[in-house]
Protein backbone atom coordinates (compact mmCIF):
# COMPACT_ATOMS: atom_id res chain seq x y z
CA UNK A 1 0.00 0.00 0.00
CA UNK A 2 1.37 3.39 -1.01
CA UNK A 3 1.56 6.00 1.73
CA UNK A 4 1.57 9.52 0.23
CA UNK A 5 3.31 12.13 2.38
CA UNK A 6 2.83 15.77 1.47
CA UNK A 7 5.86 17.31 -0.21
CA UNK A 8 7.70 14.02 -0.79
CA UNK A 9 8.10 11.70 -3.79
CA UNK A 10 6.48 8.26 -3.73
CA UNK A 11 7.62 6.21 -0.74
CA UNK A 12 8.49 2.51 -0.61
CA UNK A 13 10.07 0.11 1.89
CA UNK A 14 13.76 -0.79 1.77
CA UNK A 15 13.15 -4.25 3.20
CA UNK A 16 9.90 -6.05 4.01
CA UNK A 17 6.74 -3.94 4.37
CA UNK A 18 6.34 -2.31 7.76
CA UNK A 19 3.56 -0.65 9.73
CA UNK A 20 2.96 2.98 8.79
CA UNK A 21 0.21 5.57 8.63
CA UNK A 22 -0.01 9.22 7.62
CA UNK A 23 -2.35 11.83 9.07
CA UNK A 24 -2.56 14.45 6.33
CA UNK A 25 -4.40 16.99 8.48
CA UNK A 26 -1.65 16.92 11.13
CA UNK A 27 1.21 16.24 8.71
CA UNK A 28 2.27 13.29 10.88
CA UNK A 29 3.90 10.09 9.64
CA UNK A 30 3.78 7.26 12.19
CA UNK A 31 5.92 4.13 11.96
CA UNK A 32 5.70 1.19 14.34
CA UNK A 33 8.60 -1.24 14.52
CA UNK A 34 8.26 -4.85 15.57
CA UNK A 35 10.29 -6.07 18.51
CA UNK A 36 13.95 -6.93 18.04
CA UNK A 37 14.53 -5.03 14.79
CA UNK A 38 17.50 -2.82 13.94
CA UNK A 39 20.18 -2.07 11.36
CA UNK A 40 23.67 -2.92 12.56
CA UNK A 41 26.89 -4.16 10.93
CA UNK A 42 28.95 -5.00 14.00
CA UNK A 43 32.34 -3.25 13.91
CA UNK A 44 33.75 -6.10 16.01
CA UNK A 45 32.76 -8.66 13.39
CA UNK A 46 29.67 -10.06 15.08
CA UNK A 47 26.43 -10.92 13.27
CA UNK A 48 24.78 -8.18 11.23
CA UNK A 49 21.15 -7.20 11.76
CA UNK A 50 18.87 -5.80 9.04
CA UNK A 51 15.40 -6.67 10.30
CA UNK A 52 14.22 -3.06 10.51
CA UNK A 53 12.73 -1.49 7.40
CA UNK A 54 12.86 2.11 6.22
CA UNK A 55 10.09 3.93 4.38
CA UNK A 56 11.81 6.17 1.88
CA UNK A 57 12.15 7.61 -1.59
CA UNK A 58 14.87 7.68 -4.23
CA UNK A 59 17.32 10.36 -3.15
CA UNK A 60 17.60 13.30 -5.56
CA UNK A 61 20.83 13.29 -7.53
CA UNK A 62 21.46 16.94 -6.72
CA UNK A 63 22.09 18.40 -3.27
CA UNK A 64 19.11 18.50 -0.91
CA UNK A 65 18.05 18.40 2.73
CA UNK A 66 15.42 16.24 4.41
CA UNK A 67 14.31 17.26 7.89
CA UNK A 68 11.61 16.28 10.37
CA UNK A 69 10.67 16.67 13.99
CA UNK A 70 10.87 13.25 15.61
CA UNK A 71 9.52 11.67 18.77
CA UNK A 72 8.88 8.22 20.21
CA UNK A 73 5.41 7.83 21.68
CA UNK A 74 5.69 4.26 22.97
CA UNK A 75 7.35 3.32 26.27
CA UNK A 76 11.07 3.72 25.69
CA UNK A 77 13.46 0.78 25.65
CA UNK A 78 17.22 0.55 25.16
CA UNK A 79 18.36 1.55 21.66
CA UNK A 80 14.83 2.20 20.38
CA UNK A 81 14.73 5.17 18.02
CA UNK A 82 12.96 7.38 15.55
CA UNK A 83 15.33 7.52 12.58
CA UNK A 84 16.12 9.42 9.42
CA UNK A 85 17.73 6.77 7.24
CA UNK A 86 19.96 6.61 4.17
CA UNK A 87 20.18 3.21 2.43
CA UNK A 88 21.75 1.70 -0.68
CA UNK A 89 22.22 -1.91 0.41
CA UNK A 90 22.90 -3.73 3.65
CA UNK A 91 26.61 -2.86 3.52
CA UNK A 92 26.14 0.82 2.62
CA UNK A 93 23.79 2.86 4.77
CA UNK A 94 23.64 5.53 7.47
CA UNK A 95 21.12 6.59 10.08
CA UNK A 96 20.48 9.63 12.24
CA UNK A 97 18.62 8.54 15.36
CA UNK A 98 16.64 9.94 18.27
CA UNK A 99 17.68 6.98 20.41
CA UNK A 100 17.34 5.80 24.01
CA UNK A 101 20.65 4.90 25.63
CA UNK A 102 21.46 2.07 28.07
CA UNK A 103 21.90 4.82 30.68
CA UNK A 104 18.26 5.85 30.28
CA UNK A 105 18.94 9.05 28.31
CA UNK A 106 17.37 10.12 25.05
CA UNK A 107 20.06 11.32 22.66
CA UNK A 108 21.04 11.92 19.07
CA UNK A 109 23.06 9.00 17.71
CA UNK A 110 24.67 8.66 14.27
CA UNK A 111 25.71 5.46 12.51
CA UNK A 112 27.60 5.29 9.21
CA UNK A 113 28.15 1.92 7.54
CA UNK A 114 30.59 1.04 4.77
CA UNK A 115 30.60 -2.74 5.34
CA UNK A 116 31.08 -2.12 9.09
CA UNK A 117 29.14 0.35 11.25
CA UNK A 118 30.80 3.41 12.80
CA UNK A 119 28.55 4.32 15.74
CA UNK A 120 28.77 7.66 17.58
CA UNK A 121 26.73 9.24 20.38
CA UNK A 122 25.96 12.94 20.02
CA UNK A 123 23.81 15.39 21.99
CA UNK A 124 21.64 14.37 24.94
CA UNK A 125 18.00 15.41 24.39
CA UNK A 126 16.15 16.61 27.49
CA UNK A 127 12.80 17.22 25.77
CA UNK A 128 10.33 14.79 24.25
CA UNK A 129 11.26 15.50 20.64
CA UNK A 130 14.15 16.59 18.46
CA UNK A 131 14.45 17.82 14.88
CA UNK A 132 16.76 15.79 12.64
CA UNK A 133 18.19 16.70 9.22
CA UNK A 134 20.08 14.86 6.50
CA UNK A 135 21.88 16.96 3.88
CA UNK A 136 23.46 15.77 0.64
CA UNK A 137 26.59 17.50 -0.67
CA UNK A 138 27.61 15.51 -3.73
CA UNK A 139 28.96 12.17 -2.47
CA UNK A 140 29.18 13.57 1.06
CA UNK A 141 26.43 13.73 3.67
CA UNK A 142 25.88 15.85 6.77
CA UNK A 143 23.78 15.12 9.84
CA UNK A 144 22.34 17.87 12.05
CA UNK A 145 19.93 18.07 14.99
CA UNK A 146 17.94 20.91 16.50
CA UNK A 147 15.77 21.53 19.54
CA UNK A 148 13.57 24.05 17.72
CA UNK A 149 13.98 23.43 13.98
CA UNK A 150 15.63 26.84 13.57
CA UNK A 151 19.17 26.58 14.89
CA UNK A 152 20.90 23.39 13.79
CA UNK A 153 23.76 21.70 15.61
CA UNK A 154 26.35 19.95 13.47
CA UNK A 155 26.59 16.23 14.16
CA UNK A 156 28.55 14.53 11.44
CA UNK A 157 30.05 14.89 7.95
CA UNK A 158 31.03 11.81 5.97
CA UNK A 159 31.73 10.56 2.46
CA UNK A 160 29.75 7.50 1.40
CA UNK A 161 29.03 6.17 -2.08
CA UNK A 162 26.22 3.72 -2.80
CA UNK A 163 26.72 -0.01 -3.14
CA UNK A 164 24.60 -2.07 -5.49
CA UNK A 165 21.61 0.26 -5.65
CA UNK A 166 21.00 4.00 -5.67
CA UNK A 167 20.35 5.83 -2.44
CA UNK A 168 16.97 5.86 -0.74
CA UNK A 169 16.36 8.36 2.04
CA UNK A 170 13.50 8.29 4.50
CA UNK A 171 12.16 7.27 7.89
CA UNK A 172 12.48 4.30 10.20
CA UNK A 173 11.56 3.01 13.66
CA UNK A 174 13.75 0.49 15.49
CA UNK A 175 13.35 -1.54 18.67
CA UNK A 176 16.37 -3.87 19.02
CA UNK A 177 15.83 -4.58 22.73
CA UNK A 178 12.11 -3.93 23.12
CA UNK A 179 8.78 -5.36 22.05
CA UNK A 180 7.96 -2.45 19.74
CA UNK A 181 8.64 1.21 19.00
CA UNK A 182 6.25 3.82 17.65
CA UNK A 183 8.00 6.78 16.03
CA UNK A 184 6.21 9.92 14.86
CA UNK A 185 7.60 12.36 12.28
CA UNK A 186 6.10 15.75 11.52
CA UNK A 187 7.21 19.12 10.12
CA UNK A 188 8.65 17.03 7.30
CA UNK A 189 10.48 19.13 4.70
CA UNK A 190 12.40 18.23 1.54
CA UNK A 191 14.39 21.18 0.21
CA UNK A 192 16.42 21.19 -2.99
CA UNK A 193 19.33 23.27 -1.75
CA UNK A 194 22.97 22.95 -0.76
CA UNK A 195 24.01 23.92 2.75
CA UNK A 196 26.68 26.60 2.41
CA UNK A 197 28.04 26.28 5.95
CA UNK A 198 27.66 23.16 8.07
CA UNK A 199 28.68 24.73 11.37
CA UNK A 200 27.02 28.15 11.55
CA UNK A 201 23.69 26.94 12.93
CA UNK A 202 21.73 27.44 9.71
Describe the predicted segments one by one.
Residues 1-202:
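Extracellular glycan-recognition regions
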Amino acid sequence: MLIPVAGLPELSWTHKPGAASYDASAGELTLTAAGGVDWSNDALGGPSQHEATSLGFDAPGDDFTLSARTRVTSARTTFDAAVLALHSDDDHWAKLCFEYSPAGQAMVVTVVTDRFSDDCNSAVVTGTDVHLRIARLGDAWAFHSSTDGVRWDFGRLFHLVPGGARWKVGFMAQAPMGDSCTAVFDRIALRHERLSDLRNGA
